[in-house]
Amino acid sequence: MATDGASCEPDLSRAPEDAAGAAAEAAKKEFDVDTLSKSELRMLLSVMEGELEARDLVIEALRARRKEVFIQERYGRFNLNDPFLALQRDYEAGAGDKEKKPVCTNPLSILEAVMAHCRKMQERMSAQLAAAESRQKKLEMEKLQLQALEQEHKKLATRLEEERGKNKQVVLMLVKECKQLSGKVIEEAQKLEDVMAKLEEEKKKTNELEEELCAEKRRSTEMEAQMEKQLSEFDTEREQLRAKLNREEAHTTDLKEEIDKMKKMIEQLKRGSDSKPSLSLPRKTKDRRLVSISVGTEGTVTRSVACQTDLVTESADHVKKLPLTMPVKPSTGSPLASANAKGSVCTSAAMARPGIDRQASHGDLIGVSVPAFPPSSASRIEENGPSTGSTPDPTSSTPPLPSNAAPPTAQTPGITPQNSQAPPMHSLHSPCANASLHPGLNPRIQAARFRFQGNANDPDQNGNTTQSPPSRDVSPTSRDNLVAKQLARNTVTQALSRFTGPQAGAPPRPGAPPAGDVGTHPSVGRTSVKTHGVARVDRGNPPPIPPKKPGLSQTPSPPHPQLKVIIDSSRASNTGAKGDNKTVASPPSSLPQGNRVINEENLPKSSSPQLPPKPSIDLTVAPAGCAVSALATSQVGAWPAATPGLNQPACSDSSLVIPTTIAFCSSINPVSASSCRPGASDSLLVTASGWSPSLTPLLMSGGPAPLAGRPTLLQQAAAQGNVTLLSMLLNEEGLDINYSCEDGHSALYSAAKNGHTDCVRLLLSAEAQVNAADKNGFTPLCAAAAQGHFKCVELLIAYDANINHAADGGQTPLYLACKNGNKECIKLLLEAGTDRSVKTTDGWTPVHAAVDTGNVDSLKLLMYHRVPAHGNSFSEEESESGVFDLDGGEESPEGKSKPVVTADLINHANREGWTAAHIAASKGFKNCLEILCRHGGLETERRDKCNRTVHDVATDDCKHLLENLNALKIPLRISVGEIEPSNYGSDDFECENTICALNIRKQTSWDDFSKAVSQALTNHFQAISSDGWWSLEDVTCNNTTDSNIGLSARSIRSITLGNVPWSVGQSFAQSPWDFMMKNKAEHITVLLSGPQEGCLSSVTYASMIPLQMMQNYLRLVEQYHNVIFHGPEGSLQDYIVHQLALCLKHRQMAAGFSCEIVRAEVDAGFSKKQLLDLFISSACLIPVKQSPVKKKIIIILENLEKSSLSELLRDFLAPLENRSTESPCTFQKGNGMSECYYFHENCFLMGTIAKACLQGSDLLVQQHFRWVQLRWDAEPMQGLLQRFLRRKVVNKFRGQVPPPCDPVCKTVDWALSVWRQLNSCLARLGTPEALLGPKYFLSCPVVPGHAQVTVKWMSKLWNGVITPRVQEAILSRASVKRQPGFGQTTAKRHPSQGQQAVVKAALSILLNKAVLHGCPLPRAELEQHTADFKGGSFPLSIVSSYNSCSKKKGESGAWRRVNTSPRRKSSRFSLPTWNKPDLSNEGIKNKTLSQLNCNRNASLSKQKSLENDVSLTLNLDQRLSLGSDDEADLVKELQSMCSSKSESDISKIADSRDDLRMFDSSGNHPVFSATINNLRMPVSQKEVCPLSSHQTTECSNSKSKTELGVSRVKSFLPVPRSKVTQCSQNTKRSSSSSNTRQIEINNNSKEEN
């Protein structure tokens, strides 16, 4: 159409488009019609249609006038009458187009110009339309997003409500369950008390029965002793009669023989032969027989000890037990009885004292018994005792002695026994004494074994085993006549008879046991030789108590002589008595070693042939040690385990141990710990009688045991530890004690190797060669050190053994001790001054040996043990326990002590080139390698002969150790820069905190170092912000907060290595290890970004407020300009505001603006005029005529709670909200002139209020500011204290987090719980002005191991801060008249006695529930500190009486009705009261509860007051008159808080009587022992939703029953445990019959901002 028509015309005037047209064309090309909506397309179509119509109209009009205009334009000026005009026309027509110029304007050009203009306008309109469409599109998109967000918000709100409902149900259910469980706990506690009472009664009865049983046992023992005494007397009398009968029979026989001889003599006389010689022969024979077979019953009266009631130990043994005879009272001036006398050596006991308990063994009465050899006519078996008489027994005609051996006589000179102190001792058996019987042994041998052990484990007549009962107080000569001694003597008799003469061809006599059993179960014969001058003892002296019966006397045994037995070379049976008095507690060094007492008196020679010389017995009283049984010490040899080297027993191939059962009561245990191994001996009699397994079958074969020479016997005795036999052999003359066997082992070597200390002592005292070496060059000291027998080593060193003797292979005693890991031997050798540097032929040192076995203790001794000063070895040993503690860390003394060994010894290489470090590293002994590495001179780079270093041969663990050998441990610290002065609340913040120690090795690169620093920081931030060891749960807030505080490695501003700055990722030419060593960097400091850089990372780390919240606070200040921070006192408002101001200042300065911070402290006298001057002087408030300033002003108003916000800021609210010249405000200056001012945009105003919530007229200011509330139960305050104390603990432990069981963690948890519980209780009391922020608890001391410091700090905090605030808050609430002043209630200057009682009750409850509960100190220690806490000794009886006694006198039958007098409405902003409902419809519930309270008050009034304060000792009338409405309401709240467990904040208090500690002076108030003692049942009540503080209290009279309140549990004060059941029943009855609702108005509502 118009466009087409226009396009048909020639485009003569179209010129190229300019830049604007090109831009429009480009915008048009970018315009996309496809993206337009339908409405937009319609609008676009309508616009374009209008443009087209306009163009068409213009074109049509121009066409209509085209011709006329053309003619008029072209020819209008010409006239036909003018020829010049025609010429001009011809000229124009004839000239060319380029040469001719138009005479007039061409209309087509005008049209084209118009069309071009329209086209440009069209493009411009299209661009504007596209922009409008894009804006419209964005608007629609934002609307859609807003709708989606609104829908999502609604869904979340709905879900939140559902979750709240569910949580509410769960909480109610948990509360109900807690109450049920509390009831069950009380019931179980009551049951437990009953059971414990019954248990105590049963214990008393049991004790009484035990005492009666002990009395019965004593009586039975006495009766048994009497019976034994009578039986012994009867046996003695019977034996005497039998002896007399035997004498008579013998005498009759002699007479008959004499008659026969006389008859023969008569016949010979008749024959005429000479009868004189024949007369003398019978006389000699008679004399000889009288001497040999007669029994001297007249000289020495003997008595039997054996009891007829004793059981036979083995049924297969048909030989009855034989009695033991003894002389009762030998005369001191006459010779001792030889055959029946017992040689006794009673040694000292190591661990006994006179008067020891009844379990003492009878071993104190057992000495060394050397029996005489019985003649043939005196060896007879009797059931109740051996017969004594002059007639030989026809059944025992064969003597056990050789036929040529005459019966020995006993003509001994008189020896006065020496009395020696012999206290009772415990008898200990050898290790194998309790082994089970071997089934292959002869029953007789088994019976003999039990007989040898009968001193401690023999069964009595009732089959019971008595554990070594104490012996009776008997005469000195009769105390050692025991059955076991008789058995031992006969065993020695039979064994020694084999040593001294042949027995071949001697058949056993009939009725006697076989010869093979002689040594193990001998037949005890009586060999009594007549002596002269011994007085007869009367029968009234009681015999000794048998060893199987408990003694009657509890007094210590009197001294009796210790007998030393000597057998003379004349073979006479001599038993001399000689005593060796030794001190009981004398150390080994104080005793004479190897003393021998030998009787050298000449004995009358017998007319019988002489026997070979018999060895005399040398008995030395052993030093202090383990008291061993008399029958168990003759053989102590348990065989050591067979190990290579020096561990083979000496002469073990031909070892024959001679069975000598001479009773030797030693006071030490010769068996060392290293040689006593279980199962070392497989013979039952080795430990009991000294027999070796190879000897047993020889003794059972009936013939004599084949014996080697005396030197070999000496070695065998020394190897087996047979002290008795060894002492006998050492007393022989001409015996070579230094004789060596084939292996070169001497007797001393064998004894030292097997650890027989007594044998070593005997040999050394006998002057054995101490340095005699075997064929391999090992000395006794080498053997003892190798086997670990440190007592033998000590003895050998004392006898000047060569401690540096080297064997053929170069092994020294120290080397052998280190090789076998014998720590005690090493210590003894080192203290003796041995050389540590002696090397073997292979080049090994003792250090090599110790490391080769991996023995850490041996290596420590070698490296650090110093030779002690003379006389101080004991103290050195005691102090060594902590010197070598590898785990000591920084406190280990090993780090302070220097090694003793030199670097040459540590680095010494063996034949293969290996040092001790090579050996330890190759075997993986990391501990040994670590000890070696501590030596400063260790060369870890030394190579062996294969060119390998220690690192090359090391295991993986040891390689890691070597790599960290020279690592530098440099502490890493975090610094937050300079802390501002303490008036900003930052006095408890620390500038620097050590978080860890970095290990920098030689091969550490800078990349590794950067990663280590970053990882250490990340780990530290996560550690302090996580809930790792915090076991405390949040008891006030259910929402979970982000534990991360927002710090990371990106928060670092700079890092300094010592004094050199460094950044993460930066590298130097030197390695980190070289760099640290060169610059001597002692620490690495990380500086966090702070306000100076416009960041808040350092503020976050210093205050533990999450970084995200601090950034949010800064955004609010920048956006709204007017922000006030408010919260409880101590919530760090001032610190937060100041740090935000610093950060904002540096940000503005970085942007190019000048900035200034103006700080003003507001007090009660701070006026509005002063504030106006502050605003004007700081250029924050400028006149309207003045132009705005570019300077940024930050004003901080602190402590606004001290002034009235409405009065102070009322005139500034509108200008602050609308900062422009359009809303000015007129202020009057001091000169009376008024001027208009306004706040400019570059002014920031921040304020702080130390108040939990606003009240009264201050609420009018709320809408004009942006408020940031710092609640104690929400972030950031909720977790701030937890994070701060956790960082404090981590810093105290040098970057380590202690385990939860650590006392420091428990102390910190307690401090945190005190703050939470305290605020929770104060919030429940409705006293928000007393709430505390975490600032006061930031100074909690963290002292490991000293929880008392924290308790003392808590007492100071309680007395100085908490108590005054609580007291002021309670008094302000309990006061009758409220002052609406500044939103705070003030108490009266002189509170009444009732108000004082309420305050002290509140303090007592808070102290017990919030502070003392959960204290980590034990109860005893805590009670010592409770006196430091004020207000903890208030009697709760006063509080409990308020429930019923604070009402008016006229209202005795019901609860106090609500008072709606006009005084309750005196002020609009007065605090709401806790009203009671109208009681017109009271039921049984009120009467029941009232009666219950009256009964309880009556019982509690009997209790004494817990304080002497006159103001607290109130009588009932005073309480009735003092209680106001507010006081009663507060008391009821205290009452509910004291007893209720339904609140979430106190639900964690344990149900135990120790949790609520009531402190009184008398301790006679069980009614206040615990709050859980009373059993509660919930009473359903309905409450009104808590009203905000600015609402009036008139709603208490109206019937507004919004059912949004939470049901509460009716509770009472604690009652005694005895009244629990009654209270619970009354509560149930009252709760079941009441419809009363308690409407309660809580003024502690939370403000919604």
From Swiss-Prot:
Residues 119-276 form a coiled coil. GO terms for cellular component: actin cytoskeleton; cell cortex; dendritic spine; FAR/SIN/STRIPAK complex. SMART domains: ANK (SM00248). It is found in: Cytoplasm, Cell cortex; Cell projection, Dendritic spine. Disulfide bonds: none annotated. The modification Asymmetric dimethylarginine is found at R498. Residues 411-422, 583-593, 1639-1649 have a biased composition (Polar residues). InterPro entries: Ankyrin_rpt, Ankyrin_rpt-contain_sf, Cortactin-Actin_Reg, Cortactin-binding_p2_N. Residues 368-379, 386-396, 1624-1638 have a biased composition (Low complexity). The modification Phosphoserine is found at S1524. It comes from the Eukaryota. ANK repeats lie at residues 709-739, 743-772, 776-805, 809-838, 842-871, 912-942. Residues 1-23, 366-440, 454-478, 499-616, 872-897, 1444-1482, 1616-1649 are annotated as: Disordered. It holds the Pfam family AAA_lid_NAV1. Keywords: ANK repeat, Cell projection, Coiled coil, Cytoplasm, Methylation, Phosphoprotein, Repeat, Synapse. Interacts with CTTN/cortactin SH3 domain. Interacts with STRN, STRN4/zinedin and MOB4/phocein; this interactions mediate the association with the STRIPAK core complex and may regulate dendritic spine distribution of the STRIPAK complex in hippocampal neurons. Activation of glutamate receptors weakens the interaction with STRN and STRN4. Regulates the dendritic spine distribution of CTTN/cortactin in hippocampal neurons, and thus controls dendritic spinogenesis and dendritic spine maintenance. Associates with the striatin-interacting phosphatase and kinase (STRIPAK) core complex to regulate dendritic spine distribution of the STRIPAK complex in hippocampal neurons. This is Cortactin-binding protein 2. It comes from Aotus nancymaae. The gene is CTTNBP2.
